[in-house]
């Protein structure tokens, strides 16, 4: 079974939390029993999260050797110039090593998304922009660290697709069961 969930902002990509006070978890969304997250989205990120009850499928979805592209819409602080975008495309050096090259483009206008709660801070004197970033890795907070490394701090991060699966019309907290056969074999 493969479940597509639009993970809201402020929710952990796990079913329990022992911190005090406890944070929101996947347990509140009425997901099918026995599924678990195949990959993660950090607490401050939102969007597509895949869940499955199939171990081999989870491996194919998360192992970097299978190169499942992950696509994000990223609101950044600043006005990206050509050199910053090219650096992201070429791959940047992070503290855990260089990233693979990425597909990056500036979106001409802000994507139509649901409101975030709490809203992203607005600074009238500092411009912001939206980027579409596609990577085939999945390091901890990778996209946030990549944009920060070129001087563009991330304000909002929404994963919109993983491989052949996309959010489509799912609203935050909504989920659907989908076809797991869309996983491409490793190249």
UniProtKB/Swiss-Prot annotation:
Instruction: Cite a single Pfam family from the UniProt record.
Output: PseudoU_synth_2
- Keywords in alphabetical order: Isomerase, rRNA processing
Give a GO biological-process term: rRNA processing
Return the EC number: 5.4.99.20
Q: What GO molecular function annotation could you give as one example from this UniProt entry?
A: RNA binding
Isomerase as UniProt keyword? yes
State the PROSITE patterns in the record: PSI_RSU
The active site is formed by 42 (nucleophile)
What reaction does this catalyse? uridine(2457) in 23S rRNA = pseudouridine(2457) in 23S rRNA
The function of this protein is: Responsible for synthesis of pseudouridine from uracil-2457 in 23S ribosomal RNA.
Q: Which PANTHER family match?
A: PSEUDOURIDINE SYNTHASE FAMILY PROTEIN-RELATED, RNA-BINDING S4 DOMAIN-CONTAINING PROTEIN
Family to which this protein belongs: Belongs to the pseudouridine synthase RsuA family.
Query: This chain belongs to which protein, by name?
Result: Ribosomal large subunit pseudouridine synthase E
Organism, as annotated: Xanthomonas campestris pv. campestris (strain ATCC 33913 / DSM 3586 / NCPPB 528 / LMG 568 / P 25)
What is the name of the gene encoding this protein? Answer: rluE
